[in-house]
């Protein structure tokens, strides 16, 4: 499983609840459910609240959402945190150090701590200073900000063009290596 942004939130949930997911790459995602409830069979995870008053608007009118969401570490939000310790395989967190959309580094560190507290050592984080939120395959153009439905303003994704491009190249190599190490021969595990 490879996923990015809100998709990484869903991808991490799938890793926790679906035994078929045996290796997971989460690119700038979260370790909990935000915005809308997550429903799977009889399970319903309520989202961690967001705080519109925490949205920051820069001089050009673009929105920074980095501090907009509630904190998964708060006791009242624990029911929304994914049980990453239940995942069936390793998890690789790819993090942009200049992510303006999510507090991705904190989310990844929280998930890794959770894995370790349950005796798991198969989680790993790769941090790319200067990379923004949308770390995609190499040579895709960097998107510093874009219009997003419902905001009525551009949303900042972050990233320095040179550092972001380098991160995309390096991250892609690491992702391919991760999947080669963890998926080759995994069909026999199902």
Model-flagged regions — what are they?
Residues 109, 113, 117-190:
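C-terminal catalytic histidine-bearing segment of alpha/beta-hydrolase fold enzymes
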Residues 36-39, 104-106, 137-138:
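Short, solvent-exposed loop/turn and secondary-structure capping segments
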Residues 98-102, 133-134:
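Acidic catalytic loop of the alpha/beta-hydrolase fold
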Residues 19-23, 88-90, 121-123:
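Loop/turn elements at helix/coil->beta-strand transitions in domains of secreted/extracellular proteins
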Residues 65-83, 97, 108-110, 160:
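Active-site nucleophile elbow and catalytic-triad environment of alpha/beta-hydrolase enzymes
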Residues 87, 93-95, 99:
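Short beta-strand/loop motif that positions the catalytic acidic residue
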Residues 1-53, 64-75:
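Primarily recognizes the serine-hydrolase "nucleophile elbow" in alpha/beta-hydrolase
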Residues 80-86, 185-189:
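Surface-exposed acidic, glycine-flexible loop patches that form ligand/cofactor-binding
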């Amino acid at each position: 499983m490879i996923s990015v942004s809100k998709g990484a939130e869903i991808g991490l949930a799938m890793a926790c609840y679906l035994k078929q997911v045996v290796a997971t790459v989460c690119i700038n995602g979260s370790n909990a459910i935000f915005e809308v409830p997550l429903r799977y069979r009889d399970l319903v995870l309520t989202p961690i609240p967001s705080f519109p008053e925490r949205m920051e608007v820069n001089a050009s009118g673009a929105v920074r959402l980095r501090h907009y969401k509630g904190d998964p570490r708060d006791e009242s939000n624990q029911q929304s945190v994914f049980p990453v310790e239940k995942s069936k395989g390793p998890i690789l967190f790819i993090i942009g150090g200049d992510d303006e959309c999510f507090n991705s580094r904190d989310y990844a560190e929280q998930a890794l701590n959770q894995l370790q507290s349950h005796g798991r050592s198969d989680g790993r984080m790769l941090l790319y200073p200067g990379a923004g939120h949308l770390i995609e395959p190499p040579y895709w153009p960097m998107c510093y900000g874009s219009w997003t439905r419902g905001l009525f303003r551009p949303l900042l994704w972050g990233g320095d063009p040179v550092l972001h491009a380098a991160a995309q190249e390096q991250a892609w190599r690491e992702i391919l290596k991760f999947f080669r190490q963890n998926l080759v021969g995994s069909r026999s595990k199902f």
